[in-house]
């Protein structure tokens, strides 16, 4: 298969774009019945189950979140399991001026697990190549707003996420075997829709190394 080595694909694509360094690929296996002795299946990052995964930007909980991600569909269920993206640049541009002033200079606190050191990132970030502003919060990883009451911060994150995930800003991909998708985590959020675990879903993933977030 020409995409068996997904790291080669992302290496060539991302270096053609901006010189980002690719990481090795990993399989995301979602199966009801797993091969005996395959310890990878117990890792939730590889097998997160069949439920819906919340909106997020990859590795937003790290000090230098990853830039590009690539998914390659190998085995796809008959229904469900779609991946959906939203455009955070368009979402920011569509905010009214009062909302833009409200979030200017704010920072969100992000974590995947309390066992890990949280990462603080600007709520509005600058894309280094285009200079465009984009929202950078997600309901899946952004926990509260630095310096705010926690409940009020969560409410703001929720409002921004609800705004950003309007259908006008979103694309939902219906997977077919052999499909390849690539996206820029600096200007998007994504989620996976749920599916029946009686069916197999195997998707290969690879990504580039991270970079520091530029505040607006």
Positions of the model-derived regions?
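Non-heme Fe(II) oxygenase catalytic core, chiefly the N-lobe of the double-stranded beta-helix
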Residues: 1-180, 186-216
């Amino acid at each position: 298969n020409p995409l068996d080595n997904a790291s080669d694909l992302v290496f060539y694509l991302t270096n053609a774009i901006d010189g980002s360094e690719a990481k090795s690929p990993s399989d995301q296996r979602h199966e009801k019945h797993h091969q005996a002795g395959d310890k990878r299946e117990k890792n939730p990052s590889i097998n997160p189950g069949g439920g819906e995964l919340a909106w997020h930007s990859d590795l937003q909980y790290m000090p230098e979140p990853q830039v590009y991600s690539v998914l390659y569909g190998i085995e796809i269920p008959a229904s469900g399991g779609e991946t959906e993206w939203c455009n955070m640049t368009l979402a920011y541009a569509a905010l009214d001026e009062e909302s833009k002033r409200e979030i200017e200079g704010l920072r969100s606190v992000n974590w995947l697990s309390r066992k890990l050191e949280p990462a603080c990132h600007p709520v509005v970030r600058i894309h280094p190549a285009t200079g465009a502003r984009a929202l950078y919060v997600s309901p899946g990883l952004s926990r509260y707003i630095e310096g705010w009451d926690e409940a009020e911060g969560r409410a703001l994150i929720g409002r921004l996420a609800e705004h950003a995930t309007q259908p006008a800003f979103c694309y939902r991909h219906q997977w077919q075997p052999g499909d390849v998708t690539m996206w820029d985590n600096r200007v998007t959020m994504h989620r996976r829709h749920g599916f029946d675990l009686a069916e197999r879903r195997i998707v290969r993933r690879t990504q580039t190394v991270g970079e520091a977030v530029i505040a607006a």
